[in-house]
Amino acid sequence: IRYLVRSRGLGDVYKRQNTNRFLANLSAEYKITDAISAKVTGGYDKSDAKTIALFSPEVAGINRVSGNGQGTYGTFDQTNKLFEATLSYNKQFENSKIDVVAGYSYQEFAREGINAGGIGFGPDMGLAASQLEDQYDLIANTISGSFQNFAYDQDRDYVNRIDFGAPFDSAFVSEPIGTSYSQLFTAYFANTFDNTDELQSYFARVNYTLADKYLFTGTFRADGSSTFGPENQYGYFPSGAFAWQIHEEDFIGDNVSTLKLRLGAGVVGNQEGLGYANFIRRTRFSDIGITDNLTVTNSGTQFVGNNNEALQWESTLDVNIGVDFGFNNDRFNGSFNLYRKETTDLLLLSTLAAPQVPGIETIFQNLTDGKVVNQGVELALNYDFVQTEDFTFSSSFNVAYNHNEVLDTDRIIDTGPINGNGLTGAFAQRLQAGYPLFSFYMAEFTGFDENGNPTYVDVDGNGEGDPDADKKFVGEDAQPDWTAGLSLNATYKNFDFAAYFNGQFGFSVYNATDNAFFNAGGITIAKNVTTDVLTSGEAPGSSVAVSTRFLEKGDFVRLQTLSVGYNVPMSGEGLFDSLLSLIHISEPTRPY
């Protein structure tokens, strides 16, 4: 449970969040013969979250809240289910062995919840918090059958429901709630949602080992997802790999403990980020809210999503070659990899020039006439520097380089929307062949003139730099060229120490916060700005167009994890053989 209290008085703003989670996994295996076995696995993951946030009626200067306490109540329940069945065959021969697995998997991801709100309560924040939840239960229990949302104010109440068995023109029903209930607020609304996604897979894998030296692997997957239309729900993804354990050969010296050559090629599918049923236009009631007049809004029907039944799986062909090596019983070991990945049918959220549905200006599409290529190299090294009875010290280092480029498409897609005052329709990136994905495309900022107005590079040659007409690729993108990591591990008697550093280099970040808020224009409307704005020479009424003015280097090195521990020896055969005292510091997020 997390509580957040802030503002000028301890009771002015109140927030409570409570999350519960239950996980369970069960498996059963049956050996049919010495070589054949069957296994069934089930998984259940249930979480429910509840959030209540309140503004006291004593808060001043916030629209419609002053004198009228306002709060929101929300729930989010998610249930993930897994069923998997496999049949395995394992056979050892005189000079080889084979391992075959075939299986079926089904996953269900169900989400449902409530977004509710009320206005018009007194200064007792604890009472108001409980009433926000109670009000929903009071009304929901009086409504017969399912519903999408309901609301009331001092003049009316209504409930909206969808009859899925009725013809379309009579399926959407809006009517009075009809039964008596206690009204705990001046106005109250509740919107509900309920959706389910499914993933079904058939798969097979064959591993064959010859003479403990040569390893062959082949796999095949057929994955079906409800996030795509009926004609494109399934994607088919084969892969194969070969490995040669060279250290098993007679011509390799004893000091070489590991030497393996690896070759692999395979196709991997992706459907992440699509959301629920974005391949088809649907109709539902719009969400209800509260107006500044303390009345609830009307809720008519609206379209959701855009028709795109051609939406399909994104696929990535990964071809790689690598070497694993180790010396002196792997005291020094590592790996080296070269790879090339070609992504086709890239899934992207693009802006529609002529929206199918008013107000819905974006659509998920596949980049069907092009591909995105990633190719690079990876190196990992590990070394045990000291190995004694009282003291050990080891280190691991990895570094990788990646080159990214969009190829073979004639499309030009503007991405990276930037929001804020004066930034309607603004964007910071463009997808175009010959450039990396997420390349920044904008005017190049050169400073301020004598009047404090921003100046830009003149690209079109008309003698004047214009932030809209003189956009260009500025040679920066949002993907790092280099990534690296370093871990240090040591023990001294009962003490242990671990540290992990990581870094990313060769990429840029657009500071949309500075663009929207921290400029001289904020001074004229009584907004806080950073101190550098006061000395920048910028005029208060100048343009805040998207430009390299707000483009920053994203390179960083950070200490991500640091831990120090001490093991306290304990005599006897109790429940614990040792007690670990641990100091642990972790930074999971980027420092910008």
What annotation goes with each model-predicted range?
Residues 478-509:
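Glycine-rich, aromatic-lined ligand/substrate-binding cores of catalytic
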